[in-house]
């Protein structure tokens, strides 16, 4: 990688660490009022993500084009826009149920990230082709884990604002998937894997 690319990646890691610190502070303030386990589970997932971003192994195939960089920044720091206001948000179903949904999403994330290991990162890159475990079902299982966790959070903190934020987030996530696959398809092994595993995001659906 060039010096400029190294600086950009380091800056993104610092921003990610700063963002999760800000989010953790807000979650803690929210927990003192609502005692919502769901929010704590969501925080645990974000901490896991940032930890893996920081320790991700370097690669020369990362995509530093402006569009994937911007999509990654906006999608990775969505929690700056999430509302945790217990006075305006609506709890649609009990916290015990939404916590269960969020835990299921977090467990799936961990399951997928164990298989991916240090090949995880914020920007699209071709590090290692993984085709075992959850990657046998869908090509982007980590995103699916995020989605399930976020659905648990939304059912516990429902508002039109949060719906809008998450809709925007998953439009960006889908854009990231497309750019990630453009980079990964440089590898013939990944092109063969893509032919075998038809579903990108949700098992047997999408």
Identify the residue ranges that each predicted region occupies.
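Solvent-exposed interhelical
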Residues: 127-145
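Membrane-anchoring alpha-helices and their flanking helix-loop junctions
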Residues: 1-123, 152-206
